[in-house]
Amino acid sequence: MVHLTGEEKSAVTTLWGKVNVDEVGGEALGRLLVVYPWTQRFFESFGDLSSPDAVMGNPKVKAHGKKVLGAFSDGLAHLDNLKGTFAQLSELHCDKLHVDPENFRLLGNVLVCVLAHHFGKEFTPQLQAAYQKVVAGVANALAHKYH
């Protein structure tokens, strides 16, 4: 559960309505893989990740980034039940993919940076604070099934 004021929730959902999920998702996942290269080990099947340009131009990275932000959108629609919303993804990432749950926090922080870049002055410090609460809640929900 994420504790947002009514104003914060409105601001988060209003901005999210302007997000180009295809573009932002690919950029966020790509930046995660470039900035934290050890995360690439989970994406070896994506092909060429040999350089920042290769990562950022990789169509599989872009497609998976879109998928990730689609799940994030679902979370925004269910802020009062993030653990339930992400239960299956948590189990998948824990039991089958063996993803370090710290990576969820890292991706959330990268997403906030990408949103700030895309929205400039519209992404106020107050809006950033609200998004930090949301990405922390999502990361916590995704880590829930870990033992």
From Swiss-Prot:
Tissue: Red blood cells.
Record-level Gene Ontology MF annotations: haptoglobin binding; heme binding; hemoglobin alpha binding; metal ion binding; organic acid binding; oxygen binding; oxygen carrier activity; peroxidase activity
Organism: Ateles paniscus
GO BP field: hydrogen peroxide catabolic process
Record-listed Phosphoserine modification sites: S45
Modified residues (N-acetylvaline): V2
Protein name listed in UniProt: Hemoglobin subunit beta
N6-acetyllysine modifications at: K60, K83, K145
Cysteines joined through disulfide linkages: none
Entry similarity comment: Belongs to the globin family.
Role summary: Involved in oxygen transport from the lung to the various peripheral tissues.
Signal peptide boundaries: none
S-nitrosocysteine found at: C94
GO CC term, one of those recorded: blood microparticle
Keywords: Acetylation, Heme, Iron, Metal-binding, Oxygen transport, Phosphoprotein, S-nitrosylation, Transport
Domain Globin: 3-147
Gene3D superfamilies cross-referenced by the UniProt entry: Globins
Taxonomic classification: Eukaryota, Metazoa, Chordata, Craniata, Vertebrata
